[in-house]
Amino acid sequence: SVVLTNNYQANDTYADANNDIDSWMKTMSRFHFKPAKTKAGEPVPVTGWVQVGVGGLSKAQIWINPKDNVWPEDDPYFTKAPWQDATILPPPTRWGGDLPGGRLPPNVRFFDENGQPKHWPMRYTLAHWATLLKGIARGSYDVRCRTIDLNGIAQPMPRPFRKSGRNTIQRFSLTVEG
C-alpha cells in the first residue's frame, strides 16, 4: 500500500533538533595527513580532502599562523588571512572499477568519451589536495584549511551555521622544534 503524508517524521529525522534539512551540500575542506611535530627548516607535507558541494570548487587553501599571533575578533572566518593555495590532485584514471576493461559504459553523464570527468573536481564528489609547507621557523602554530567555491565564496560561507550543514574551518596544531 502507498501512504501519503505530510508528517515531518516521514523524511526528517532531525526536525526536533532544528536542523535545516533543505540546505544544499556545502563545499568544504578537511585534513587527512597533519603532522604534530617537525624540525625547523624541513618541508612539511600536509594533505587533505574536499567535499565539493553545489557551489563547485575553485581551490583548496591552507594557512599557517603562529599561536601567539592573536587573530582579530572582527574576522571570525579568517577572510583577511594570508591563505596559500594547495594543489588539487587529479582525478582517478580508471573509473570503471570491475567493469570490462575498467572503463565506464558510453554516454555516462559528465564524463567524456575517454571515461574522464569533463570538469574536475565534480560537484557532489570528494577530491584530495596536497601541499608542502616550507621555511617554517621554530615555534607553535595553528594550521587551517578551507575551500573557495566557483562563485568565489570562502568556507564556511555563505551559511556558516552548524544547523545548515557543518563546514567549519578545520585546524590542527603544529610544533616546529629547533
Labelled PLM ranges:
Residues 1-178:
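Extended, aromatic/histidine-rich regions of cofactor-dependent oxidoreductases associated
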